[in-house]
Amino acid sequence: MPYLKFLVAAIAGSCMLVSIAKAEELPAPIQMLANQGLTIVDTFPAPGGLKGYAAEFQGQAIALYLTADGEHVIVGNLLNLEGRDIAADPLYQLVTGPAQEHAWQQMERATLLQDGDADAPRIIYTMTDPNCPYCHRFREAAEPWIAAGKVQLRHLMVGIIREESPAQAAAIMGSPDPAEALVNHINRRERGGIEAIPRFVRIGEPVIRANHRIMRELNLSSTPIVYYRDENNHVQVIRGMPQPQQFEAIFGPRP
């Protein structure tokens, strides 16, 4: 596994997880990985004399297993007889779940493009670049639910794909009706999208800069990124264009 070589060369990017390293002295192999950039979040039970550690690195949950002699650490998946990773539930509870709730809260506090009925029963957050074709496809896929008043998309507009993306994103956010501007842009995408009118760009630029900071804080670098709550009210995230079989899980029953 190329984990260790990769970890040495990078710096951890997450601040919201509480590390147990500050509260207790870690075994040497675990401390070695903490020194290389991992955030050691907590421990969890593991079989075979191992001790599990839930860690986070650049937004990704990682399972570590300390051997009984305290001299070695195993990094990666540990499967049971059914082929299930025994760390799946602990990592979600200790790392992934809290991180995704944190991301949801950051989205709630951001300046967003509200696309759909304000009273819609289902809210979905998505990071959108004006020139991202998969963002366009996601918006088009959501249209039946938006038109029926079942879903409101809340777009965190960013500009990362093309040179003109930041100005177009700012123009959309600075326009009198950002939701209408986004739909017009998508409908005109084959002709280059909407014009980046300077007065609208000036209004929208601070929003786009703030949204880029959120992307960096969440260790995200692509679009679309979709956040939604599942039937258990847990925050789920999909990176990239969701598959059609995922639509009802995201948007709810088809109208």
Where do the language-model regions lie?
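Extracytoplasmic thiol/disulfide redox context detector
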Residues: F6, L17, K22-S165, N184, ...
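Acidic-aromatic/histidine active-site loop/patch
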Residues: E190-G193
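Acidic, Ser/Thr-rich peripheral helices and adjacent loops at domain boundaries
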Residues: Q168-V183
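Acidic beta-to-alpha connecting loop that harbors the catalytic carboxylate
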Residues: E231
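Structural signal for short hydrophobic segments within the conserved structured cores
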Residues: H234-I238
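Repetitive helical segments and hydrophobic/amphipathic motifs
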Residues: I11-S14
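Bacterial N-terminal signal peptides that target proteins for export
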Residues: M1-V8
